[in-house]
Amino acid sequence: MNGAHECFCRCSRYLLTLIRATFGRSGRGGGMIRGPLVAGLLGEFIMARKPASMYRRLKGPAYTRRKFIGGVPNNRIHQYHVGNRVAAETGKFPVILELRADNNVQIRHTALEAARVISNSTIRKVAGTQGYALRVHTFPHHVLRENKQATGAGADRVSQGMRCAFGKNVGTAARVKRGQRVISLQVHPEYYLTARDALRKASMKFPTPCTVRLIKGHEHLKGLI
């Protein structure tokens, strides 16, 4: 036990020395600069990512004019159409399902990408790459701002903050109204249950309850619905 504790202390001192040598001993505000790993080991304050619950409510007008905004983070959503897009646009899939939001909410671009990834992975394992068509209908136009502050032990000594601060750009979000479709999925009748499960998993990534609605194909699903 003593040997492990001595090794831990030695590693902590080594990392702290390395950070000091790389970034200098003091920062612009006079506080000591420490890397995130050293800060975690020594229990110091670090800049934490705020939870999505802080951004899910619709407040004020949308902040979207990117030509006047500098430094907007890149969008995490890589694809809005996945699967057999040609068959979907020509109407070859007899069953169409939609995932709709139950509340007015803001959905961050990271949540939209996570929902797309999990739903696409679920349906592709069963239907194959050409047996479905998935589409994300919402685009994260709204730019999120955050007043950066240090959090953790001793943070109140160095970061008092300012009331009603404008903040810096930290991400983007889509403003979704109640009943608005977020994701749609087109499949063949034999993959209906898997498609519902894929949209259910996608809804778990959003900060609001969602409803899966069958838009087309009731006549092909006798005994399943």
Question: What are these regions, as identified by a protein language model?
Answer:
Residues 7-11:
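Cysteine-centered motifs
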Residues 15, 23, 33-225:
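Ribosome-associated RNA-binding proteins
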Residues 28-30:
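Intrinsically disordered, glycine-rich low-complexity segments
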